[in-house]
Amino acid sequence: EFALRHGQKPERIGLLTTGSSLLKVALHPAAAKLREAVAAIIANSLTWIDVQSLTDPINFYGSDPKKALGITAGKGPRIVRVRFRKQLGKSTYRSIKYNFFRVHRQFVYAAERRTGYSFHAILCGPQPLSEIAANGGLARRWPARKAPEGQHP
């Protein structure tokens, strides 16, 4: 909302929310300004991806932030569901799956396997957020170029 008020073009702005964490704050009665900001984001049709995981008991899995906040006009977020089990090796997944806080943080941790969701690839990679949202996740083969020998992509 700040960027819009300061002249940024809507097509150059995007929002990535993880674990439906926005709702943890926005549903509080005192969060009127946050709800107004979310309504402005929706009204301006900004690209917005909300990532959720069934494995995470702390997130609002299955929710639609736009509907949950009672916003009727505009386009809500593209909801992307991620399976941490597919992102992690068996031993890593086994070691974290009962640690609720560690599972919740997995949204922003590096993935051990390529999937359609990688926090770091979405924020720092070459693929535009609008393209990621349209496809429901990262391109199947990212990065587009091959990494030099001995380096991980």
Positions of the model-derived regions?
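Membrane-embedded segments
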Residues: 2-3, 12-15
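Lipolytic serine-hydrolase domain surface
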Residues: 14, 20-153
